[in-house]
């Protein structure tokens, strides 16, 4: 993978953030930040400049699909993958239209998360 890729994890669930962090960390990624909502995500993105963002869809405040749009406005090259418990076609389409590269449905297998991360960075 070369130089370790920096990741920002965005999810309102501490358990989910911890699980994603554990999987990515043991596979060579460096988790540089975690956010519980969209506002924190946008603030941290500007400061941390991560290579990859994992984004939940349903969180307090703005939906993840709107946050993706904001991140892409800040950085047209922002690489975002959605990790969500919702597998609704309209949300998948909206996330992709707003700039997400991959959509992983919870619960997920470790391999699925890692494959999506690699494709998003691709």
Question: Language-model segments: what does each one mean?
Answer:
Residues 48-54:
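Active-site beta3 strand of CheY-like receiver
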Residues 14-33:
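Two-component/phosphorelay signaling modules centered on CheY-like receiver
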Residues 37-40, 63-66:
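Acidic catalytic/metal-coordinating carboxylates
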Residues 60-61, 88:
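The feature encodes the CheY-like receiver
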Residues 10-11, 35, 53:
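Conserved sequence signature across two-component system core domains
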Residues 90, 108-117:
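C-terminal output helix
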